[in-house]
């Protein structure tokens, strides 16, 4: 009982008295569950073998305008804010001018990858892009991410 009380007091001090954290952070008394995490560490796990990933259906008879509308929607609704902002601004700027072949490449890029973090890391050049996705569209996306025009991208562009 005394041990539990002591542990509870130590944890509550760490949570509710942050000024004590810095004083003892230099010592070796930092509990492992409160150890600082470095900002430059990328947590990236391989997809497990037992997790079956669904195949993305190919739509060969889809009209080009319908495909572009679908891709515009999918670029805006990725499930993670970072890609929502990057891909929605990219699609608003370039998708309307893509040819049928470029549109198919963009479709494969955003729907063929099983993990959105991969797209983000490739576009920001944190991780090298695999050869199958290193296309003209990916190069255009990387240039868009560099934001040479210094455009503010705090929100998705309006739909027109």
From Swiss-Prot:
Record-level GO BP terms: copper ion homeostasis; mitochondrial electron transport, succinate to ubiquinone; mitochondrial respiratory chain complex II assembly; protein-FAD linkage; tricarboxylic acid cycle
CC terms in the record's Gene Ontology section: mitochondrial matrix; mitochondrion
UniProt KW Glycosyltransferase keyword: no
Chief localization: mitochondrion
Places the protein is found: Mitochondrion matrix
InterPro entries named among the record's database cross-references: SDH, SDH_sf, SDHAF2
Superkingdom of origin: Eukaryota
Pfam families, per the entry: Sdh5
Keywords: Chaperone, Mitochondrion, Transit peptide
The UniProt record lists the keyword RNA-binding: no
Transit peptide (residue range): 1-30
Family per similarity comment: Belongs to the SDHAF2 family.
Role according to the record: Plays an essential role in the assembly of succinate dehydrogenase (SDH), an enzyme complex (also referred to as respiratory complex II) that is a component of both the tricarboxylic acid (TCA) cycle and the mitochondrial electron transport chain, and which couples the oxidation of succinate to fumarate with the reduction of ubiquinone (coenzyme Q) to ubiquinol. Required for flavinylation (covalent attachment of FAD) of the flavoprotein subunit of the SDH catalytic dimer.
Assembly description: Interacts with the flavoprotein subunit within the SDH catalytic dimer.
Protein name in the entry: Succinate dehydrogenase assembly factor 2-A, mitochondrial
